[in-house]
Amino acid sequence: MEVKVLSSIKEYQPGPQIPQRIWMPLGLPSRGTRLHDLICEGLPFEFFDRIASHLHVQREVVSKAICVSPTMLSRRAKAGRFNTVESDRLVALVAVFENALYLFENDVAAAARWMNSSNRGLGWNRPLDMMRTRVETKAVFDLIGRLERGVLV
């Protein structure tokens, strides 16, 4: 008797990883349990300045993007750590910037300009202003994907 393997069963192939070029200089893992643990514990405050510097934006811009008031930012600096929600928003901001870098072929200045510019595909909002919620962040990821594929927005 012959055993047939179903042709509809496919071998698992892991999805594309987020490139390391932005994560490594920041000292953050791009995925996996280390990243999950860091977010749950709260990112150390030192990552805030690294992220702002790497994204070529001022601290106030990053603070506003992740919905942290100046008063709360000073509290986080004293505590030395962000909470889970703020950490998640910071990591989402890095991931969006990574995709913008890919869109602009690693031109950091162009990606930073795009992140700071009003965009028709986002209802004339800036991508940096769309980091408050997962839905808004997903809209930015979706827009980058459409632009990469040449879909008019």
Regions of interest found by a model, annotated:
Residues M1-V153:
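Non-transmembrane "mature" sequence context
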